[in-house]
Amino acid sequence: MRFRKWAPLISAVFMMSCFTACGGGQSASATKIALSANGVSVEGAAISADPDDAVYLSRETINTDKNGDGGASSAQTEVSVIHITSPGTYRLFGTLEEGQIRVDLGEKAAKDEKAIVTLILDNAHLRCTVAPAVLFESVYGGSSEENAAKTGANILLAEGSINTINGSHGAYRWAQGAVSSRMSLNIGSEEDVVGTLSLTADQEGICVEDRLTVNGGKIRISAENNGIRMNKSDSVAEVNGGDVHIAAGLGGSGGAVDTEGQLLLSGGTVIAVGGDKDPVLRGGNGVFVNGGTVVALGSPSEGLAADSEQVTMELRFDEEKELKDTIVVTDAEKNAVFAYDPAADEILSGSPRIYTAAMISCEAFSEAEMYRLYLGGRAEGSSAGGVYDMSAVTAYSGGTEQAFCITEEQNESGGVLLSSGESTSPSGTAVPSRFTEFYLGSKVNTFFGIADK
């Protein structure tokens, strides 16, 4: 096997790795649930209070204890809980204040392939300050890769809809998100005009035990802690499509995606901004970038996998960067191949952030090429959520070059790092699988490279 190596010219660390995508679908006929301050209706009739019905309403008192001591800080809040107890598709619209959508199909649901619920959010606005706003407690598991498309918990964003979820967290580990699921969860959008979901969380944004699959939709997550949290070592978080922007760690700690298992980025756009204490992306069993556009800004990501499919650039800066300037990557001729303007990303509006590491990947990157990184300046063209459509960018000017790198062939036995015109041969260290170790100046010791397929 052959390797390629970067030749950086500043103290930023580059990592090239060979780190594929589905969309949403049309929904079946659905039971309509109308939400309002004047009451909840199901198919035009007032919602039932009978637990034997497929959809019913209860009022529950939730104890909140901010200090965990049961003292004067404790309070009780009454919450409206809309229970869904039968498989099917449910279309929600309107506003639910201090309420929760709870899906529980019973103890045997986990192994019942018919125990599937799809919530279509059709201009729905859900708010709960003391618990998850959406809670999938018991549905079909469907956690294996083969059954990912047949997951029991599904959220579908209605065509052209604008939806908001503002939620808290529960007492259980699996219920720490504004949207929480004890089983696997799929999120997508109806076709044609993409639906939007803006999610705000006082803890985790989305918390799933087994498998989270995002297939489509415009999704914006603002979270005090992690944007997406997966608790199990065999869990999988996967993005196949859609436009996902995450601002995490707003409370100081937390990453954009934190999974004990695998993180698979296979399509769509993912913009991830984390806090300054935890990795912006972390996969206990690997972070795989296989397709799409990925920008991760914050503390260095953890678990980047070498046996992935898309060329990825990782940079670690010697000093903090304020997240305000356009980030541009050009080719050797200084033609822009990637551009992102955080000032145009609505999820970062009014939220000053810093970063010490950046991970960038897009389909335009290829092996054996030279790239330049710029911060600042102005790109002429159209962008969506700060990400530029490179086919429409006509010019770029005014930026400050941070570094450039060149890939060239190198064999497994070692090689040289070209830095400030000097050559240095690695010695006395083991060569990690799929990577060659290099030294960058006197401060940095890191791995970077890309393996030929």
Regions found by a protein language model. Give the residues of each.
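A composition-driven surface/loop motif
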Residues: 22-453
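Bacterial N-terminal signal peptides that target proteins for export
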Residues: 1-10
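C-terminal motif of bacterial Sec signal peptides marking the signal peptidase cleavage site
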Residues: 17-21
